[in-house]
Amino acid sequence: FRSRLQLRRTQGTSAAMSADLADSKFTIPVDSENKAKSLNIFSFNFPHHASFHMSWMGFFVSFVSTFAAAPMIAIIREDLELTKPNLGSAGLAAVTGTIGARVLMGSVCDVVGPRYGLSIVLLLSAPFCFCMSYVTSAAGFLICRMGIGLGLATFVACQFWMSCMFNGKCVGLANATAAGWGNLGGGVTQFLMPLIYRGMTSATEGRIFSAWRWAYLVPGLLHTIMGVAVMFVGQDLPDGNYKFLHTSGQLEKKSALNTQYLGIANYRMWCMVATYGFCFGVELTMNNIVAAYLYDQFELDLVTAGTLASCYGLMNIFARSLGGVISDTMSLKFGMRGRLWTLWVVQTLEGILCVFMALAKDSLATTILFMVLFSICVQASEGASYGIVPYITRRALGVASGYIGAGGNAGSTICMALFFTSASIATYDGIMYMGFTIIGVTLLVVPIHFPMWGSMFFPGDPNVSEEDYYIAREFSEEEIKEGLALSVQKFCQNSYQERAPSMRPVESSEAKV
């Protein structure tokens, strides 16, 4: 059995390379899985780049709505008479409610596809945006923030979709850019919602407690529009939608229980769950607290605090993509080991800068400087993380993406509960403690080891192939005979580039497109 896999590996390389030129229905270079080999952010080419734009816009909308309360919190807490524990609990609810939703979303993507997953979660969370206009108590505020926060599960569909549409040579960049531009909503909402609030205040003749409620209609409408657009315009895979491919026999009908087991049994996934909890989880936490921190610590007005706070999220314009680019570049030079080193270095630097931001509590200018540098490392760590995630498992990619994405929310829940809910801990102290925690948790990158590629400190085993890891480990011999592993075989061939350069197959000149 093992020798048969080795034979497939040596015979499949040239076939996979020639397949790049075989399918003429695409106007851009694709690999043997019909995945795009490059990302052009200015292209709307269907289906690859159209999916890219729909995925990031759907995720962007969920971020805008989830953190819409943060820049208006000074008005909301006065209207609803909220205490610091009330605000902390609501912030927790906004990011905690989606933990289960993200785990579930992974299986949804594996079984029915990312298009349905992204669309349905946007439409289900839209009513909570509208209901925020009718909230009159702390309990109602908490429930609505939790319901709106479910929209953050769109992240899993976003990353799954990109991993299905883009080749390993640019998957880090595609994942990072789509997620980064989506996360940008957390920065945009910091200045967008105060502006909408100001406009509504004028429209309601100065009734400030009505103005913030009317402002919430905008996120609700955005959810509805994007949910419908993704449902009727998007496409799951380069070759078509899940339903068609299942019916035609071109795509395996996956068992949700089997894919759950494959994901849960992979220890690499759990290491990434923890580390992602302290990059994306930190971003969620900062989106919840930074505007109020600047407002209270430096006695700023609402719009100024929101505008400065938006600098944190606005780094997503380039910083998460930067992490993906560095990960892809290091992979070309050093293989998977380069990706792992990138994540550890950038995320450790994130923790150090977080501590420096806390120590700068007496200077607004220094606080903003370290906040921006800290933010860049946070987003870059997220981009570097999802340069690794697509390689943890192939058959259970959705499950792995779901759990790791949920780890981000779990990390935010832990940070909010430990450092920013108790009235006895000053916010700047909470930020400092969070920085030290980031540095410690990031050490979990060290034990991540791929048998064929190695880890940070140890090389891979040349006697172990990609087929051994992705096929022999995840499929039974009967399933292989039935042809269920054929699509994964193509993925294995396209993953040879994650080896150390000296171990990669030599491409013929005609195959280099």
State each model region's role.
Residues 9-64, 78:
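Cytosolic juxtamembrane N-terminal segment immediately preceding the first transmembrane helix
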Residues 67, 94-103, 153, 187, ...:
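Residue-level signature of mid-helix packing/kink "hotspots" within the transmembrane helices
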Residues 69-73, 265-323, 382:
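Extracytoplasmic gate region of multi-pass secondary transporters
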Residues 100-139:
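Conserved MFS/SLC helix-loop-helix module at the cytosolic interface between two early adjacent transmembrane helices
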Residues 116-130, 337-355:
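Structural signature of the two symmetry-related core transmembrane helices
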Residues 144-182:
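Cytoplasmic helix-loop-helix junction between adjacent transmembrane helices
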Residues 172-198, 316, 404-415:
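Glycine-rich segments within core transmembrane alpha-helices of 12-TM secondary carriers
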Residues 178-238:
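Helix-loop-helix hairpin linking two adjacent transmembrane segments in secondary transporters
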